[in-house]
């Protein structure tokens, strides 16, 4: 697999379209950080780590409202292996006028675009969610 982040986002997107309550994804430190940001921003209910060693998986519990509509309507990869996208702190765009979130990889780790702008650090824009 050449792009594990795109694979993670696709698994989440497929689980949402199939109305699953949870999705299992092979674990890595980067995927755990993305799951943490999704939870902090309120897009997923929770996530847990299952298994040991190389068999570890991240189980993400998806969030739906009373009508069965997912809190995630759009989930897209921005920077990809063939076309990296780097932005300074002032260049990081607001997603849907602040209703969405960018996931940015900075020198201080993964954070939301809002946090990166607040701390005045730029980085690689990995994904966009709303």
Per-region residue spans from a language model:
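Core subunits and conserved enzymes of cellular information-processing
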Residues: 1-130
